[in-house]
Amino acid sequence: TFETATRNTLDLASIPLLKTMSHLPIIVDPSHATGRRWMVESMAMAAIAAGADGIMCEVHNDPEHAWCDGAESITPETFEHMMGDLRKLAPIVGREI
């Protein structure tokens, strides 16, 4: 797209579509998809709800001083919180973590 508010566009509709096209696990990267750390957790939750089999994201203990991808990196504490939320969400949408 030509959207400039985020780094890229995370097409959540592609997750269930890909599930019909492949036997392979679908892994979503909300860090690079958005380029903004404050969006990572909500996009990770949306991806799991849409059927993603896994999440990969940038984690850094000091994102402001990361050599690369700092703007999209979450802290270990944020990652821990996100994983707690994902563990609560997963069974609600019929998924396991």
Where are these regions (language model features)?
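C-terminal helical cap(s) of enzyme catalytic domains, especially alpha/beta-barrels
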Residues: 61-95
